[in-house]
C-alpha cells in the first residue's frame, strides 16, 4: 500500500535547495502557474512553492493555494519522477475555483509522471 504522507523531508526548505532547481530546470507552464523540475539524488520527490504577495495579495488566499498544492503533491508523489519541484504562482490564480486549480495541477504533474 502506498503511503500518502507529506513530511518535512518532502519539502524544499533551504535557499540552496531552491538554487539547485533554478540552475538547470525543466520548465512546464500554464497561464497561472509554472513548475520547475530537476532530477535530484534522493529516492523521493520534493516540492517547494513560491507564492508572491505581488500576485496574490491576501494572506488567506496564498495559504489556500499552498494547501491545494501540498495536497495535490501528496496525492501524486508516488507517480512522480525523483525530482525537486518548484511551483511558482502567477496572477489570476485566485480567480480560479478549487476544481480548476486542482485540475491544472494534475495536468502539470502529468508531465512529470514516471513511465
From Swiss-Prot:
GO cellular component, alphabetical, reads: ribonuclease P complex
Keyword tags: Endonuclease, Hydrolase, Nuclease, RNA-binding, tRNA processing
Q: Does the keyword RNA-binding apply?
A: yes
What the entry lists under Gene3D superfamilies is as follows:
3.30.230.10
Presence of the UniProt keyword Methyltransferase in the record: no
Q: Quote the SUPFAM superfamilies the UniProt record gives.
A: Ribosomal protein S5 domain 2-like
Q: Name one GO biological process term.
A: tRNA 5'-leader removal
Q: What is its EC number?
A: 3.1.26.5
Q: Which GO terms describe its molecular function?
A: 3'-tRNA processing endoribonuclease activity; ribonuclease P activity; tRNA binding
Q: Please give the InterPro entries that the UniProt record associates with this protein.
A: Ribosomal_Su5_D2-typ_SF, Ribsml_uS5_D2-typ_fold_subgr, RNase_P
What chemistry does it catalyse, as a reaction equation? Answer: Endonucleolytic cleavage of RNA, removing 5'-extranucleotides from tRNA precursor
Q: How does it assemble?
A: Consists of a catalytic RNA component (M1 or rnpB) and a protein subunit.
- What is the role of this chain? RNaseP catalyzes the removal of the 5'-leader sequence from pre-tRNA to produce the mature 5'-terminus. It can also cleave other RNA substrates such as 4.5S RNA. The protein component plays an auxiliary but essential role in vivo by binding to the 5'-leader sequence and broadening the substrate specificity of the ribozyme.
Q: Write down the HAMAP family for this protein, in alphabetical order.
A: RNase_P
Give the family per the record: Belongs to the RnpA family.
Protein name stated in the entry: Ribonuclease P protein component
The organism's lineage is: Bacteria, Pseudomonadati, Pseudomonadota, Gammaproteobacteria, Candidatus Palibaumannia
- Name of the gene: rnpA
Amino acid at each position: 500500500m502506498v503511503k500518502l504522507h507529506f513530511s518535512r523531508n518532502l519539502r524544499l526548505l533551504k535557499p540552496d535547495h531552491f538554487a539547485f532547481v533554478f540552475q538547470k530546470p525543466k520548465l512546464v507552464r500554464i497561464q497561472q502557474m509554472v513548475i520547475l523540475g530537476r532530477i535530484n539524488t534522493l529516492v523521493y520527490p520534493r516540492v517547494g512553492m513560491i507564492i508572491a504577495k505581488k500576485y496574490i495579495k491576501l494572506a488567506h488566499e496564498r495559504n489556500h493555494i499552498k494547501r491545494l498544492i501540498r495536497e495535490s503533491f501528496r496525492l501524486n508523489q508516488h507517480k512522480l519522477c525523483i525530482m525537486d519541484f518548484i511551483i511558482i504562482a502567477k496572477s489570476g490564480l485566485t480567480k480560479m475555483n478549487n476544481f480548476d486549480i486542482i485540475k491544472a495541477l494534475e495536468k502539470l504533474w502529468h508531465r512529470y509522471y514516471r513511465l
